Swiss-Prot record:
Gene Ontology terms: cellular component: plasma membrane
Pfam families assigned to the protein according to its UniProt record, in alphabetical order: Glycos_transf_4, MraY_sig1
Gene Ontology MF: a single term: phospho-N-acetylmuramoyl-pentapeptide-transferase activity
Name assigned to this protein: Phospho-N-acetylmuramoyl-pentapeptide-transferase
Localization of this protein: Cell inner membrane
Disulphides: none
Species annotation: Aliivibrio fischeri (strain MJ11) (Vibrio fischeri)
């Protein structure tokens, strides 16, 4: 919205030309989202406590988690509010890529909200029935997939970018829709599975969003896109502002979610953030880099798949408990050690993924 206003005012006040610069708006986006989260946090936590909207803890989980019972959840509301207000203020709202990410973010946030609400009201860990959760996740993802395919058909926006091979960029055709669906739904659920310890999911999300901010900027800049041998997609550059909003809101939420957490994001936050990251990866054509950057999310998800598969096929468990962060807790690692080590791994994976952009 501000960019529209600046276009009008810059003819009278040259200062407003600053708002045309993507880097300036990205910085303001981080500051705005961070400020909103820090301001909103205490109020939301107090409101959730008054409503007795507390975390439901599994009885078969680590004993150290029993003390978390009753800690306010649904803190993802502050994240989504901060991101939404910030994007509305600083992003170019004529850019369809911005709306695609926001549609998934808020749509998945709504699904997560219903899931959290059912968990809190019924005081169990079941939440929204699985088939309905996947139905709404799938519906939202498919709407975006079909819309993006129709908009960018047979252009760089629907090519498959393969790491390490600068000349391998095949057109996906209708397979683009299927890939987009799996990336969005898969990333959403992967982040959701990772959100099991204080601050465990939010920092990798921040790291990945920061990585995608750079990739979006490079993809939208014709010189850098050619230099890195990646598709040039002009609309992608505005996603820098969206990624910056995720970073700012994430840091603001971490202020209250760091160990010992005052609030949990709940499914309203984790499903939404995962869906947004998946959508951004699709829009900048870096689905493979998402697998690398989001390696923590991938490993958490694989640990659940392997655990369930092994138990059904062999009657034996591979890990003491899945997702894998619980395995390390049951091995005796203090929760902060698990969290910080996963953060370090996540940061390194993002740096490795960015390095692959030049290794072609």
């Amino acid at each position: 919205m501000i960019i529209w206003l600046s276009n009008f005012l810059e003819q009278y006040f040259p200062f407003f030309r600053l708002f045309e610069y993507l880097s300036f708006r990205a910085i303001l986006s981080i500051i705005t989202a961070l400020t909103i989260s820090l301001w909103m946090g205490p109020k939301l936590i107090a409101w959730l406590q008054n409503l007795q909207i507390g975390q439901v803890v599994r009885d078969d989980g680590p004993e150290s988690h029993f003390s978390k019972r009753g800690t306010p959840t649904m803190g993802g509301i502050m994240i989504l509010t901060a991101i939404s207000v910030t994007v509305f203020l600083w992003a170019d709202l004529t850019n369809p890529y911005v709306w695609a990410v926001m549609f998934v973010l808020l749509g998945y946030g709504a699904v997560g909200f219903v899931d959290d609400y059912r968990k809190v009201v019924r005081k169990n860990t079941d939440g929204l029935i699985a088939r309905w959760k996947y139905f709404w996740q799938s519906s939202i993802a498919l709407v975006v997939a079909f819309a993006l395919y129709a908009y960018g058909k047979d252009t760089a926006a629907t090519q498959l970018v393969v790491p390490f091979f600068k000349e391998v960029m095949p057109q996906l055709g209708l397979a683009y829709i299927l890939l987009t669906y799996f990336v969005i739904v898969g990333t959403s659920n992967a982040v959701n599975l990772t959100d099991g310890l204080d601050g465990l999911a939010i920092m990798p999300t921040v790291f990945v969003a920061a990585g995608f901010a750079f990739i979006a900027w490079a993809t939208g800049n014709v010189q850098f896109a050619n230099y890195l041998h990646i598709p040039h997609i002009p609309l992608a550059s505005e996603l820098v502002v969206v990624c910056a909003a995720i970073v700012g809101a994430g840091f603001g939420f971490l202020w209250f979610n760091t160990y010992p957490a005052q609030v949990f994001m709940g499914d309203v936050g984790s499903l939404a953030l995962g869906g947004a990251l998946g959508t951004i990866a699709v829009l900048v054509r870096q689905e493979f880099l998402l697998v690398i950057m989001g390696g923590v999310f991938v490993v958490e998800t694989l640990s659940v798949i392997l655990q369930v598969g092994s138990y059904k096929l062999r009657g034996q468990r591979i890990f003491r408990m899945a997702p894998i962060h619980h395995h390390y807790e049951l091995k005796g690692w203090p929760e902060p050690r698990v969290i910080v080590r996963f953060w370090i791994i996540s940061m390194l994976l993002v740096l490795i993924a960015l390095a692959t952009l030049k290794v072609r």
